[in-house]
Amino acid sequence: MNVRSLKTGLSALVVLAAGSVAAQTASEEIAAHPERSAGVYHSYEYLPSEEAPVPKGYRPFYISHYGRHGSRYHSSGDLYTAPLVPLRAAAAADALTPLGREVLAKGEALAADAAGRYGDLSQRGVEEHRAIAERMFRSWPEVFSTRRGRECLVESRSTLVPRCILSMAAFNERLKELNPGIRATRESSARYMDYLAGVPAMGELGPRSHAVADSVKRAWLHPERLVASLFTEAAPELADPQKFMYDLFMLTSIAQDVSRPDLAFYDAFTSEELNALWATLNAYCYYTMGPSRRFGDPIVASARPLLRNIVETAREVIDGERNLSASLRFGHDVYLIPLASLLQTSVSAARISDADSIRSCWSIEKVSPMAANIQFIFFRHERTGDVRVRVLCNERDAQLPIDGGPYYPWETFRIYCEGLCAE
């Protein structure tokens, strides 16, 4: 093994160890904050960390970004009605317990609120992107300054899905409110889908990865206690109790995304059941969108066009070919997770094959909650012109398996990324 490979390997072990320690706290976190069990459906939670000071003499001049759309309604009516059908049947037979009637009432309210809004960005999703935009603006005011005649051009692009377009609009709206002098362009066009939405491997792998994820659900979920707490003995028999348990969990998970915590019913589950449900959803996301040894290679590789665009656009700005202050991109979890995994960020680098080990080293709510984002902040030395890059995942420093962090030398970062894109 050459020296560079050895350094990268050792760095990867450090990243994996750090991720393991962080993920091991999941059960404690869920006990204190049951809404975090929602994983990929967890609404965005700003959790600031201690920041390393910017090296002396360096000033921010450009930001590159990829963000998932904000909190939304469930994408289909089936995700609301699936757990309600057996509850309704039992209610008609007067075979629900008091807890069962309460859960049904809350579920019906969530379903009614979502009617005609499936997949839509919620108001909470709008506010998430406005808040992220404001923190970005206030953290790096030099980037968005128009003082002394400086031009600030923000280029934004999104996928063709309305919730992504509206997330882009909310983000830009807040930036313009903070500085009306910003010049912004916003596009949603098929022209950019080759890198904003390039994940064909997931469709090809879908049946196999979903089958493995379903086998995990069958092994880990034990619905007997839950079912007995909701239904009396007179209730019609459930066709698939495990599916019912998971569907019910999916329904309560979305309450936070539409600003209706009063309609959540996490208390219907024990802490052990919530942990099992979180672990099941976590494994599903890992196998279908993440860097698993079994399915991850083509999924992670699908993010290469996006990373190439990020690096090439940054090079054009650094070399003076383009006068951009920020490049903002808006898409989905199925694109952001492979990007984070391709970069081998500290929260998403773990590559394992054993399902039982996933929960100890990978937590989807830390990788891609609603409005998840990866930011690349570029700094230039005022005297020498040297450029450094800081990488943030969900507004926290992302440790990469290369030297020089958290303010990575541009050439080191560029060579690292180009290597990832060429493999």
What kind of region is each of these model predictions?
Residues 1-10:
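Bacterial N-terminal signal peptides that target proteins for export
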Residues 18-22:
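N-terminal signal peptide c-region/cleavage motif recognized by signal peptidases
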Residues 24-155, 159-327, 331-423:
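Signature for phosphate-centric chemistry
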